[in-house]
Amino acid sequence: MLLNSSEYLNTVESIKQEIRAAQYRASVSVNRELLLLYHTIGNTINAHKTRGSKFIESLSADIKLAFPDASGYSVRNLKYMAKFALAYPDEEFVQQPVAQIPWGHNTVLLDKLSSPEERLWYAEKVIENGWSRNVLIHQIEGGLYQRQAIASKITNFEARLPASQSELALQTMKDPYLFDFIPLKENMLERDIEQALVKDVTKLLLELGTGFAFLGNQYHLNVGGDDFYIDLLFYNLSLRCYVVIELKTGEFKPEYAGQLNFYLSAVDGLLKKEQDHPSIGLLLCKSKNDLVAEYSLKDMSKPIGVSAYRITSCLPEEFEKQLPSVEDLQKRIL
């Protein structure tokens, strides 16, 4: 048998996948045991809380003395353990997503969130997207839960997509989108901001969410000899469909939906393969009247969502006139 035969290569790949799966299960198991230990220690600390801070300081010193090679038993971390045990009083927390994410991620959830529902939602997103601790902090500070999980979204997805596809598309969508990755500084020139956009294009993909593959800006379509240009074209691997994004500098207008509906028909006709799901459109406007947007989408034949966008969460007035227009922005993304 040849060692480079397809059968052999498939066998090797299968074994590699089994090894990776076992490594993942082992890491999850170790993490779960560590969190159980921290939970137990936290409960013990809480049971002696009347002894005051000196108790934790003494406990930290004695643990380090008994286990000099062990880390994680500083006074600060012991206080986190106590907080962790209070946040999850039942040991059944090991069945929840928080038991599958690293301790450092859990301390972020404890520091920044008070709602159990939000903590659970962000823990699920960490598992789903493989976020680092810093990315988790960024998403919490950007209000992702409010913009994605509980925002009232203007779409016709339910009427134009199968139920499973519609639900996933809604989960993917945000309102508003936050383009806060432009590092604003005093006396910045327009070209400085443009260069920052080019440098940080990967952060645009982070804001859009998992599964987005960038295919181009000002993407050219030839329809019957006429030329058309899509602002931003993506393929979403989770939705298994093309996603057409149109950017508008002002308030939403009904004619924008008609233009995007045409682009989606063209993409479905020219690019979509048999295995692809129907293409989805997203209009990003500086502002929108929700009722006008709802009526505009009601009789559109293609699945479209309308969201607002913000350049920053808190834009200093002196920078407002220096920002490039959305048309300039989309030309310089790549």
Give, region by region, the residue ranges found by the protein language model:
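Basic, low-complexity intrinsically disordered segments
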Residues: M1-L334
